[in-house]
Amino acid sequence: FIIEHADIRKSLLNMKSIIEGERALCFWLSQQTEVSLYHPDEKIKQEASDLVSLMTPVVKTMFSDMGMEITSEAMQVHGGYGYTKDQGIEQLYRDNRITPIYEGTNSVQAADLVFRKLVNKNGDIINKYLEMVKNDCDSENEKLKPFTDELKMNLEILSNFTSWIKEKIQNSKDDASAACNDYLKALGFISIAHAWIKVLEVSFKDY
């Protein structure tokens, strides 16, 4: 059985971790959408609306890009059999190929994130989001520590990247434009990791 190969197990776990992490992120963003529409406190409504605005291009791009990568990896797991029509993987791959293109290509989504969302309210929205992620990493649950330590290390890299790209927006738009896709992907992976931290926080809780 191919499941006996460590590389196959790694591929399956990679697909599972991305899919379930994105699902958790989607649920969180849906919750923020509800809050932005119906919460009685106007300040909380606005904060949720800001988060939805910031994360919309991230979710659209990461979900469609990762959908492509995961479907391709699934085909690889099937081997040559996955390339044929028998298993349906090739159909999923072809169907998914349009998703990074329509509703604004993913490069357009990345440019929207960098040139509009990052500078909105003088960068206060992205700063608050990164601070929220950092605060959620400060859990007292020791079981979470290996995961939160890893996330905090990468969050520091993203914070430096954010400062760099904000500076480039002011002084070198070509450099900022060239880095748009990389920045969105970095923020996307941090967001998925943060969603997993929220899931693990509940899973590891002693009830």
Regions found by a protein language model. Name each.
Residues F1-Y207:
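Flavin-dependent oxidoreductase catalytic core characteristic
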